[in-house]
From Swiss-Prot:
This is Eukaryotic translation initiation factor 3 subunit I. WD repeats lie at residues 8-49, 50-91, 145-184, 189-228, 286-325. Component of the eukaryotic translation initiation factor 3 (eIF-3) complex, which is involved in protein synthesis of a specialized repertoire of mRNAs and, together with other initiation factors, stimulates binding of mRNA and methionyl-tRNAi to the 40S ribosome. The eIF-3 complex specifically targets and initiates translation of a subset of mRNAs involved in cell proliferation. Keywords: Cytoplasm, Initiation factor, Protein biosynthesis, Repeat, WD repeat. PANTHER family: EUKARYOTIC TRANSLATION INITIATION FACTOR 3 SUBUNIT I. One of its GO terms (cellular component) is eukaryotic translation initiation factor 3 complex, eIF3m. GO terms for molecular function: RNA binding; translation initiation factor activity. Transmembrane segments: none annotated. InterPro entries: eIF3i, WD40/YVTN_repeat-like_dom_sf, WD40_repeat_CS, WD40_repeat_dom_sf, WD40_rpt. Belongs to the eIF-3 subunit I family. Component of the eukaryotic translation initiation factor 3 (eIF-3) complex.
Amino acid sequence: MRPILLSGHERALTQIKYNRDGDLLFSVSKDQQICVWFAHNGERLGTYHGHQGAIWTIDVDPTSTILASGSADNTIRLWEIKTGRLLKTWDFPTAVKRVEFSEDGSKLLGVTEKRMGHLGTIVVLDIKLDVDAEQSDEKAMTIVCEDSKATVAGWSYLSKYIIAGHEDGSVSQFDGKNGDLLYNIPIHELNQPITDLQWSHDRTYFITASKDKTSKLITAKDLEVLKTYPADTPLNSATITRKKDFVILGGGQAAMDVTTTSARQGKFEARFYHKIFESEIGRVRGHFGPLNTVAADPTGKSYASGGEDGYVRIHHFDKGYFDFMYEVERERQNKLNQQQQQTISA
């Protein structure tokens, strides 16, 4: 599995994101650059200029028309993907750490930082998916996180809930329409921040990554923990693969703790776990520094990782990845194949 190395950033990556079709990959970093790449060959399509601070987060709407980014310059910006044109800027009192479009693209949530006397908030903006439409200045909803600030957040299926991960290791479920807090459950170790939250394809469950060295698979409906994936290093990111029942975790010793660590000791690897059986399957090495963000291609053919070293690596899975099965899975597949043949012959 030879990686394609994308060198378009001068500083650490903060987030990478595939569009819904899986043909474009967007990357943002602390160097104030947004890059977009063709996912199949790593060719750079272009960059989006305008932010005046480190860019923490990126998301793309379901139709691949509009791009949203959140930055340390205290703004959320909307861009036209095709031309790179800046469509709208919303200003906030503090940095924006996470943005995410709802399933239909009609709403955008933003997570703002707790700083300088301002409490952390989750804001919701109404979005028109027409590049020529006038976007509203008003926030449709603001949720104030009074206990522990939200570090990540996202929309569940049908925009029914807003799910947020917090600095104290808890996960909250808010009503997607009025912002009421429905649940707040301690999921990870106390005061070990949740660093990432990524959705399954149908948004009925999600995966978290945390500094407590674990990743958890959780239902959106009632925040029940389905699976736990233990690692031996603090985790920065986790994602769920399509086609195969795997999850990919990324992390490593924190950048500020790294002195003269070898890449092996620093544990700068992408880890593959079986989604159902919770056991580690393998690791992919390559980054020289912690993995800050991982993303799985929605078509299930590849995955990408972004590191503290400023590189994005796209890995296209080879045949062995798709053929790999546990014995129990293989037996089940053989049974299904036999049943199909019997029904055909009958």
